[in-house]
Amino acid sequence: METTVRKQKKNVETKKPSIYSLQIHEMQDWLKEQGEPKFRAGQIFDWLYKKRVKNYEDMSNLSKGLRDKLSNSFDITTLNTLVKQTSSDGTIKFLFQLYDGYSIETVLMRHEYGNSICVTTQVGCRIGCTFCASTLGGLKRNLEAGEIVAQVVEVQRALDETEERVSSLVVMGIGEPFDNYDNLMGFLRITNHEKGLHIGARHMTVSTSGIIPKIYKFAEEELQINFAISLHAPNSELRSKLMPINRAYKLPDLMEAIKYYVNRTGRRITFEYGLFGGENDQVEHAEELAALLKGVKCHVNLIPVNYVPERDYVRTPREQIFLFEKTLKDRGVNVTIRREQGHDIDAACGQLRAKERKEETR
């Protein structure tokens, strides 16, 4: 089922900072500048993240003067829902319009253990992975922290209708998260904070294609967030073909950074490995992958790829997927095959946005 909403006009000239970009201490600092007590920050966050109001007038325990100051300083309406697709398995894909007319995707996935959301960090992507729809059209801009936070808020509002909640999230949507590092970290801290969305750090996962300097930086952060690497190949030659970023950040150097992260944090790392028919899915690839990961505290997530019309890759046959998994297991690698969701909608990352861009150019 698909629901489509009319687009809003661009409103670039009147753009104010999003209130969802502010961490609690930043809100306290702003209140101090306004001559307001800092305990109001907790009240404001309660309205934003617990009651999830859509306008300042609903913040009834704040004075009209403070509500006016908030309205004059910060946008509270960040996203406009353009399209909402619901899969037969309960997966929901949202296409949101931003203030400047660009669109982004967010996906809600339902699991036995709860509801997970996949968020976007950029409008487009500059990494150029040859199998990904997100890179079509290149990178337009980074999202502000508040635009990432607002994705979770909007999806949670949709879940409020059925008294459900977002229990976990993955930063695996459109864009390279580490290419927007500061806004990513602001988002994670707001999302994790008890006064914010209060999603536990161990229920959040950040994925990167392998920007090595940011991996070292991420290892020093004081957040116990799960970490994943988009690997997709067991050697440099094949990875450079699939992921041009490997030409800048070589696989041996990436593995050194990963080992540093694991040793520094003590946390297990996840390797995402998309299976592309005839490209990286043979037994010899599995054997090479097992050798590459030997001694690394890790888990491999095998991903049967979604078909993207603009790309030439095909799905690996089911029996070959199981053989690849068995080859890894026989060599002591912790591995699972990712459950497919949203297969009957535009579920691959960037597909719905690419479809929307095509409509715009007609």
Curated annotation (Swiss-Prot):
Pfam families: Radical_SAM (PF04055), RlmN_N (PF21016). Its cofactor is [4Fe-4S] cluster. Keywords: 4Fe-4S, Cytoplasm, Disulfide bond, Iron, Iron-sulfur, Metal-binding, Methyltransferase, rRNA processing, S-adenosyl-L-methionine, Transferase, tRNA processing. Residues 111-344 form the Radical SAM core domain. GO terms for cellular component: cytoplasm. S-adenosyl-L-methionine binds at G175, E176, S207, S230, L231, H232, N306. It catalyses: adenosine(2503) in 23S rRNA + 2 reduced [2Fe-2S]-[ferredoxin] + 2 S-adenosyl-L-methionine = 2-methyladenosine(2503) in 23S rRNA + 5'-deoxyadenosine + L-methionine + 2 oxidized [2Fe-2S]-[ferredoxin] + S-adenosyl-L-homocysteine; adenosine(37) in tRNA + 2 reduced [2Fe-2S]-[ferredoxin] + 2 S-adenosyl-L-methionine = 2-methyladenosine(37) in tRNA + 5'-deoxyadenosine + L-methionine + 2 oxidized [2Fe-2S]-[ferredoxin] + S-adenosyl-L-homocysteine. GO terms for biological process: rRNA base methylation; tRNA methylation. Its EC number is 2.1.1.192. Disulfide bonds join C118-C349. InterPro entries: Aldolase_TIM, Methyltransferase_A, RlmN_N, RNA_MTrfase_RlmN, rRNA_lsu_MTrfase_RlmN/Cfr, rSAM. Specifically methylates position 2 of adenine 2503 in 23S rRNA and position 2 of adenine 37 in tRNAs. This is Probable dual-specificity RNA methyltransferase RlmN. It comes from Bacillus cereus (strain G9842).
